Each structure stands twice: as C-alpha cells, then as structure tokens.
Amino acid sequence: VKTPITEAIAAADTQG
C-alpha cells in the first residue's frame, strides 16, 4: 500500500 507521502514524492519525481 502506497502512502500519501510516497505518492507525493513519486509525483514530484515524475515532473522532474
């Protein structure tokens, strides 16, 4: 299960 924190990091990392 992904945590909201992990989701935020992944989203920011995708944006570069």
UniProtKB/Swiss-Prot annotation:
Domain of life: Bacteria
Modification(s) after translation: Contains one covalently linked bilin chromophore.
Record carries keyword Thylakoid: yes
Membrane topology label: Peripheral membrane protein
Gene Ontology CC entries for this record: phycobilisome; plasma membrane-derived thylakoid membrane
Location within or outside the cell: Cellular thylakoid membrane
Keywords, in A-Z order: Antenna complex, Bile pigment, Chromophore, Electron transport, Membrane, Photosynthesis, Phycobilisome, Thylakoid, Transport
Keyword Calcium: no
Assembly mode: Heterodimer of an alpha and a beta subunit, which further assembles into trimers and the trimers into hexamers.
Protein role: Light-harvesting photosynthetic bile pigment-protein from the phycobiliprotein complex (phycobilisome, PBS). Phycocyanin is the major phycobiliprotein in the PBS rod.
Family: Belongs to the phycobiliprotein family.
Protein name (database record): C-phycocyanin alpha subunit
Upper classification of the organism: Bacteria, Bacillati, Cyanobacteriota, Cyanophyceae, Nostocales
Gene: cpcA
